[in-house]
């Protein structure tokens, strides 16, 4: 099985959504594991539940720590090799500098169909508005409260005799269903060939005089004029016994290829048929892909294959 993404769950109370994420992760085909549970209250009941389920727990007291809380939390997350943070009843506003370090990697569950009824007392607001349907929303966390990109929603009917309490009970059931599903879906995209290809394409096509073209059925990118263009990047989709989604780029030769593969076999591979021509493979269907590193390889491969008129301009521009 491919390496699972590592999720940290942050809580402030009982952690029922945390528990849903933990139990869903026990399925054989789940793409994530809950690697850490923490929060802002050391006596939160959810910490006891997580500890009993064998999850690493990092109790923290935000009031006692004051301004040191966020740096300490950052250290705990980095030490645990966390890929994604899932907020589950975490009742603390996250500062912008912390959000910046985790952009696109913090998700939250909210008990309404956003953008309706942001903030607290959502069920009271729903009933006061006369809504016939409400639900749960999973979204990315952004600086603006409950305004990040919506990743998934699940509707819940509002009954004529509902109270905020009865409605909250049913919405919570919906939360427990949708949160693990959307987290798996969101993290699973990093193993999806089309998503990875799209990400590579954005970087490749930002380089000068590049174009998309297939190579023996595989997506690729060329540099140069139409009549004399050359491939500088080709996608690899689990071909010839190498069960990985990867990117083929040009390296300096067989010696460098052998050294890189020996030093980091989890990152590099020698692609069948392409390897003898100095194409090296970079594995991309794994957690924690360094896309800046991918961009560096694409630029390097572009320089190796681009015509002199383009490489000269690139080198001159890099001097300024």
Residues covered by each model-derived region:
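Structural motif corresponding to alpha-helix initiation and N-cap regions
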Residues: 44, 66-71, 120, 254
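Conserved nucleotide-sugar phosphate-binding/catalytic loop shared by glycosyltransferases and other
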Residues: 45-64
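Short active-site oxyanion
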Residues: 6-8, 33-36, 82-85, 243-247
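N-terminal Rossmann-like dinucleotide-binding module
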Residues: 1-45, 49
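Helix-adjacent hinge/juxtasegments
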Residues: 58-109, 114, 229, 250
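Charge-dense, helix-prone N-terminal extensions
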Residues: 191-320
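Donor/substrate-binding cores of folate-linked one-carbon enzymes
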Residues: 24, 32, 84, 88-191
């Amino acid at each position: 099985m491919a390496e699972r993404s590592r999720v940290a769950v942050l809580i402030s109370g009982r952690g029922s959504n945390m528990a849903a994420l933990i139990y869903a992760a026990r399925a054989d085909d789940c793409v994530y594991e809950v690697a850490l549970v923490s929060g802002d209250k050391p006596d939160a009941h959810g910490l006891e539940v997580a500890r009993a389920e064998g999850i690493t727990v990092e109790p923290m007291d935000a009031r006692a720590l004051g301004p040191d809380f966020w740096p300490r939390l950052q250290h705990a997350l980095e030490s645990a090799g966390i890929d994604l943070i899932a907020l589950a009843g975490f009742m603390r506003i996250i500062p912008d500098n912390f959000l910046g370090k985790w952009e696109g990697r913090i998700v939250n569950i909210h008990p309404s169909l956003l953008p309706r009824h942001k903030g607290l007392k959502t069920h009271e607001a729903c009933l006061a508005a006369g809504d016939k349907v409400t639900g749960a929303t999973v979204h990315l966390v952004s600086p603006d409260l409950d305004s990040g990109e919506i990743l998934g929603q699940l509707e819940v009917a509002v009954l004529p005799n509902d109270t905020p309490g009865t409605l909250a009970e049913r919405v919570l059931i919906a939360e427990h269903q949708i949160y693990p599903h959307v987290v798996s879906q969101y993290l699973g995209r990093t193993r999806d060939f089309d998503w990875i290809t799209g990400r590579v394409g954005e970087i490749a096509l930002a380089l000068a005089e590049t174009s998309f073209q297939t190579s023996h059925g595989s997506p690729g990118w060329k540099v140069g004029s139409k009549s004399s263009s050359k491939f500088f990047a080709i996608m690899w989709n689990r071909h010839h016994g190498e069960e990985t989604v990867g990117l083929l780029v040009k390296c300096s030769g067989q010696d460098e290829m052998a050294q890189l593969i020996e030093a980091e076999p989890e990152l590099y591979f020698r692609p069948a048929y392409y390897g003898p021509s100095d194409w090296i493979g970079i594995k991309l269907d794994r957690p924690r892909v360094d896309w800046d590193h991918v961009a560096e390889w694409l630029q390097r491969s572009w320089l190796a294959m681009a015509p002199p008129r383009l490489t000269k301009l690139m080198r001159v521009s890099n001097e300024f």
